[in-house]
């Protein structure tokens, strides 16, 4: 069928790009980490071309940097850059949660409840990677119900840009210390169920301020 090969190639590129974005956004890739095109292609079991194109796409949005010898690096996230990203995120995410309130269905709320239970379990197990991952899924599930795809795209891109800085939390934070922080997620879900727009904004603001404070502690060490 004409064009099938090209469509498959594009889908492979998008697959690699989305996978790398996810890894970047949860801090799975350490700042300064070197990604070699050939090695990555071998790990994924695909040709170099879609992998290289995916990496170049991430370079175009400053999520990766070009390095010599067909390699790319995960950029450092400086304190000043982190400040700027978090100030923008704060405004955009509070907007998204307020817009989502009226659009959440009973099924959406049930799915959020399941994610919150997974977040609680991850905290109790001390699984920092899972905490960060489920936090991301929980928040984005809410934001996407704003029905504003451009807004959500901007938020996700900012998470990709700041994500490498989260890597420092994996060994520096004891998940047991996050027990009180998880309570704010329960309060947020309760506000969502009550369709309390201002309550949702307040709860999310508390969550973001606490999470940002934890991250800044690592930068100030």
UniProtKB/Swiss-Prot annotation:
Function field: Important for biofilm formation. Represses expression of McbA by binding to its promoter region, which prevents colanic acid overproduction and mucoidy.
Single GO term (MF): DNA binding
Biological processes, Gene Ontology terms: negative regulation of DNA-templated transcription
S-S bonds: none
Keywords: DNA-binding, Repressor, Transcription, Transcription regulation
Designated name of the protein: HTH-type transcriptional regulator McbR
Domain HTH gntR-type: 10-77
Keyword Secreted on entry: no
Swiss-Prot/TrEMBL induction comment: Induced by LsrR, LsrK, MqsR and TqsA. Repressed by LuxS and YgiV.
Effect of inactivating the gene: Disruption of this gene induces 30 genes and represses 10 genes more than fourfold. It decreases biofilm formation, increases extracellular indole, leads to colanic acid overproduction and elicits mucoidy.
Gene3D superfamilies reported for this sequence: GntR ligand-binding domain-like, Winged helix-like DNA-binding domain superfamily/Winged helix DNA-binding domain
DNA-binding region: 37-56
Organism this protein belongs to: Escherichia coli (strain K12)
